[in-house]
Amino acid sequence: MVRSLLLVHAHPDDESISTGATMAYYAAQGVRVTLVTCTLGEEGEILVPDLRLLAADEADQLGGYRISELAAACAALGVTDHRFLGGAGRYRDSGMMGTPANNHPRAFWQADLDTAAAYLVDIIRDVRPQVVITYDENGGYGHPDHIQAHRVTVRAVDQTRDIVTKLYAAAVPRSAFAEGIQALRAAGDTTSFAGVEDVDNVPFVRPDEVITTAIDARAFLDRKIAALRAHATQIAVDGPFFALSNNIGQRAFGVEYYILLRGTAYPAGDGRENDLFAGVDVVQAGDVGAAT
């Protein structure tokens, strides 16, 4: 059986931030890793002053530029199969919730779910992934494109139960987020998540007990950081994060976490799965249902 992993992300850089180490980890094992990106990230904030004219409120050319950044990130992660949902530019970055960009006629937030899911079904039937990763129903932190990616992916997976065995949402457990803040502060970063006093009030943080799966990809943290560096318009490459090399930093950013949404969990000794493909060879086609 050829193992195949499909990830559905909203914008360029999302793949590297939340699942980059996982992608590199499985690609290095010879797993077929396919990344589907739903938009070009046209509404992203540009951190490079010389490229400010590419912004949505200027020349509106950021999306095209980010295609090259995404290609470099995929190369850093060892991923060779990348696709845009419906083709590059079919769906536009919707911007943050409640902004005018939500109403753009091509905004992903406005996409017809059946049409968008059909594009993804075609990809699933092509690459035949046993495992699919996207976001939870809140899109992690409530971004409309993340929410829409969840909806589209769930709809597509429910139509391809003969192929997909397990569906996961990328997640950040409370303990890992607290550890990450500690690592950033130790590295001299006093601005990231400034003012966060109660971790439980951070929108994308989930209780530890709902996390079903932890992928220890610390050996591939360097590839994740290289992929993040590739997204130079979006991520400050000179920040303390990129100097993280201590054990706390490796543990906080090199272990990635997931919640099983469809399929059956096969936990290891610590009560969590340590392999996304655990159990896929014992599940019969058509058995995919709500997570158990």
Curated annotation (Swiss-Prot):
EC number: 3.5.1.103
Keyword Metal-binding: yes
InterPro entries: GlcNAc_PI_deacetylase-related, LmbE-like_dom_sf, Mycothiol_biosynthesis_MshB
GO biological process per UniProt: mycothiol biosynthetic process
Free-text remark on how the cofactor is bound: Binds 1 zinc ion per subunit.
Residues bound to Zn(2+): H11, D14, H146
Cofactor: Zn(2+)
Domain of life of the source: Bacteria
SUPFAM superfamilies: LmbE-like
Pfam families assigned to the protein according to its UniProt record, in alphabetical order: PIG-L
Enzyme class: hydrolase
Reactions catalysed: 1D-myo-inositol 2-acetamido-2-deoxy-alpha-D-glucopyranoside + H2O = 1D-myo-inositol 2-amino-2-deoxy-alpha-D-glucopyranoside + acetate
HAMAP family per UniProt: MshB
Homology family: Belongs to the MshB deacetylase family.
PANTHER family reported for this sequence: 1D-MYO-INOSITOL 2-ACETAMIDO-2-DEOXY-ALPHA-D-GLUCOPYRANOSIDE DEACETYLASE, N-ACETYLGLUCOSAMINYL-PHOSPHATIDYLINOSITOL DE-N-ACETYLASE-RELATED
Protein name according to UniProt: 1D-myo-inositol 2-acetamido-2-deoxy-alpha-D-glucopyranoside deacetylase
Gene that produces this protein: mshB
